[in-house]
Amino acid sequence: MNLGDGLKLETELLDGKTKLILSPYEHKSKISVKMGNKAKIAKCPLRTKTGHILKSTQDTCIGSEKLLQKKPVGSETSQAKGEKNGMTFSSTKDLCKQCIDKDCLHIQKEISPATPNMQKTRNTVNTSLVGKQKPHKKHITAENMKSSLVCLTQDQLQQILMTVNQGNRSLSLTENGKEAKSQYSLYLNSISNQPKDENIMGLFKKTEMVSSVPAENKSVLNEHQETSKQCEQKIAIENEWKPADIFSTLGERECDRSSLEAKKAQWRKELDEQVALKKKEKEVSEKWNDPWKKSESDKIIWEKHQILDQSRETVLLEHPFSAVKQELQRKWIEELNKQIEDDRQRKIEEKIIYSKGEEHDRWAMHFDSLKSYPGSQSQLFSQSTHKQPEYFCVSPDTQELADVSSVCTPTTGSQVEPSEEEHIAKPIKDVVMANSKKTNFLRSMTALLDPAQIEERDRRRQKQLEHQKAITAQVEEKRRKKQLEEEQRKKEEQEEELRLAQEREEMQKQYEEDILKQKQKEEIMTLKTNELFQTMQRAQELAQRLKQEQRIRELAQKGHDTSRLIKNLGVDTIQMEYNASNISNSRHDSDEISGKMNTYMNSTTSKKDTGVQTDDLNIGIFTNAESHCGSLMERDITNCSSPEISAELIGQFSTKKNKQELTQDKGASLEKENNRCNDQCNQFTRIEKQTKHMKKYPKRPDWNINKPPKRYIPASEKYPKQLQKQREEKKVRRQMELLHLVEKNNPGHLSQNRGISPEIFHSSHQETESKLRWHLVKKEEEPLNIHSFSKERSPSSPVPVVKNRTQQTQNTLHLPLKNSSYERENLISGSNQTELSSGISESSHFIPYVRTNEIYYLDPDAPLSGPSTQDPQYQNSQDCGQKRQLFDSDCVRDPLLNPNMVKNRDRQQAILKGLSELRQGLLQKQKELESSLLPLAENQEESFGSSF
């Protein structure tokens, strides 16, 4: 172990000078880095900003020509494929170089968000120190300078310059040098996505591609020349480094050109020495034998670095791109592509082999989860060792960073030295062995079972199989039933279709038969109607001839000259034959028209139902034909004979359209034919009504809307006038009977009548009845005379039975008694006359009938049994009664109607008094009963209400 191994140092600025101090582990510097731009401030602190673990891997010489041997180290991670690439680190001798690297780190961190291809780059730091060696500014090599470069585009560089200029002055070429350094360093980190076996020519070409932007068209030569100048300037002003600002080393331009030229010459000399050293290192690397077969990859990497150094050297020459170099570049590119393809194939094969083994271990771990598989654990570590060649680390700090990245991304393993890999894998194996030594009482999934459990499993399996069989049997049974039901349903549907087809055919046949029968009936009807018309014509002709002959004979008997009539008779017979033929033809035509009209009416009714519109022309044709036929028939009949006979025939034809008298004369043989003829005539009359209606209403009615042309007439007005009158009188009489029954059943009626005179009672009663009959009086066209009586009378005559015999008899003295119809007429006429005379409506009281043959008329001059009053209405009624005549003297002899005929007045008064007392007693008894029943009814109502 060398001095300084394992120490973590940290730089600190004290009084403007940089000093190294020991820093504890897990310590992070709190020095905030402030940029010149106020808008862009570095927010993410660096993890290994200033602390570095120093590890010396080779003894160094203090001489100015001797340099430290550089060893590669791999500490990069890949997010996508898990591929690793080696990054070269070179050791420096100066502490001031660490400050330069820190500045590069800060610039790199600032630029990394702006370059998306560089997001996962690693911060590379040159950290090797020589123990107890003082810093030498003159021994800064080109490798040391260019290992900390960053590749930037011109736009990014201009943006950084503008941000710095906002806080400071314009940047000098030193800042450009810094940017170029950071650019180159980031480029080395950005090649991590490429395989490790690519040669240095590919790197050189990609360096050209990155550095030569199409917009700028800068060459690699200018980049490296500019870089060398910047490094010299930085070294020159390094003693004047100020801690206040990290850009303080970048901001000032060297004014002394002579010193710059001297520095440039010294720089070229050091580059030549570096080229010679690289050649020696290449020879040494070829002789190495790596036990993990890393010699090939190491060789490739050393070749890359050698060619890179050579390219850097040739960049400084005057002719960097000669034809020979281009040929070499082409060959190297071809070789590099071939190596890349071989490496890719080898990786694919390794992945396939590893995936097979991993699958087997995974399944074994699944079934025997308690067993430990150390091979599978170690395989995860061997994956990282066998995948890619790896390099020695400069310090464990970079290894720690790689381990952290491997923890974050499990698919990528960190590349460490073989000794360290064994050191990491060993404790894991120990943990696995310790876990396997523990006693496990749990039975794994593939462990053996006892016979009881095996039998139980077999029994369960058998049950499950039986259950599945039962389920399948049920499913099959359901499917079979469903299939049978489907077949049955289809069969029923087919039978139903056949049945419907048969019914349809039968209906069609029946319809055709009905049509044939209808046609036959129509033909028979037309034949019979023709025969009927012919017989009617012959009968008419015969009747006319007979009448003419009878008239001639009568005139001859009276002595008149009948020669002209006989002559006319002969002419008339010829004309009658001609007219008969015309009439027969017209009748035949009318039959045809009637047949057409029947079919037309049927069609129109059907069309009316379906709402199909017909033409006006058809109706006009038929109505014209019908009117023409009717006029032709009338004209023929009028021209048959003489004017007298023709007038008689016209009267017969007009009044008796159905020819029933002629059929009665002919006999019963023509009754059926007359009925058929009547049907035909009714059809013609119907058509005539339609034509009249069309004439009245020329506008056709709306379709499917039955608008009645006549006003609504109630059924009661359709009766004859006499019947209407009788119905109204019956209605009034019924109302009067109901009114008397109500008054008769009223208990206070008789008691009220005692103190009221019969005239007042009579007048009030007449007023109530006159209101009921007033509508009948209005309907009378003329008032009937009181003395006009009907000749027909019923044998029974009414006798007034008065409810209150003491009062009602005097009220009804002036009313005549007759049969029902005559009584109603007299009542109406009496009420009309009293209305005309006095203006006060009065009507007779209801009088029931008694079995007697006489009609009694009371004497108006007879004294009244009650107190007399001077009622003008009663006097008017007496005047009306005086005008009446007595038909029979027996009416005066009646003691009930005529009080003058009463011989024993005392007896009559005693009878009336007894009746009044009896009535009063009955009324008193009724009141007592009502008063006794009222509390009982109230108690019952209360009990009934309380029950609810």
UniProtKB/Swiss-Prot annotation:
Naming one, the record's GO cellular component terms include: centriolar satellite
GO BP terms: namely: cell division; ciliary transition zone assembly; cilium assembly; detection of light stimulus involved in visual perception; establishment of mitotic spindle orientation; microtubule bundle formation; microtubule cytoskeleton organization involved in mitosis; microtubule nucleation
Q: In which tissues does this protein get expressed?
A: Widely expressed (at protein level). Expressed in retina, mainly in photoreceptors but also in outer plexiform and ganglion cell layers (at protein level).
The Swiss-Prot or TrEMBL record annotates one GO molecular function as: microtubule binding
Locate the transmembrane regions by residue number.
Answer: none
Q: What coarse category fits the chief subcellular location reported for this protein?
A: cytoplasm
User: Which terms are listed as keywords in the entry?
Assistant: Cell cycle, Cell division, Cell projection, Cilium, Cilium biogenesis/degradation, Coiled coil, Cytoplasm, Cytoskeleton, Disulfide bond, Microtubule, Phosphoprotein
Q: Where in the cell is it found?
A: Cytoplasm, Cytoskeleton, Microtubule organizing center, Centrosome; Cytoplasm, Cytoskeleton, Microtubule organizing center, Centrosome, Centriolar satellite; Cell projection, Cilium; Cytoplasm, Cytoskeleton, Cilium basal body
Coiled-coil zones: 467-558
Q: Which residues carry this modification: Phosphoserine?
A: S369, S606
Q: Where is this region: Mediates localization to cilia, centrosomes and spindle microtubules and the interaction with PCM1, CEP290, CEP104 and CSPP1?
A: 570-948
InterPro entries reported for this sequence: CCD66, CCDC66_dom
Region of interest: Disordered = 458-499, 690-713, 788-808
- Where in the sequence is Phosphothreonine found? T115, T121
Self-association or partners: how does it assemble? Homodimer; disulfide-linked. Interacts with CEP290. Interacts with PCM1. Interacts with ARMC9, TOGARAM1, CSPP1 and CEP104. Interacts with CDK5RAP2, CEP152, CEP192, TBG1 and PRC1.
Task: Briefly state the protein's biological role.
Answer: Microtubule-binding protein required for ciliogenesis. May function in ciliogenesis by mediating the transport of proteins like BBS4 to the cilium, but also through the organization of the centriolar satellites. Required for the assembly of signaling-competent cilia with proper structure and length. Mediates this function in part by regulating transition zone assembly and basal body recruitment of the IFT-B complex. Cooperates with the ciliopathy proteins CSPP1 and CEP104 during cilium length regulation. Plays two important roles during cell division.
> What protein does this entry describe?
Coiled-coil domain-containing protein 66
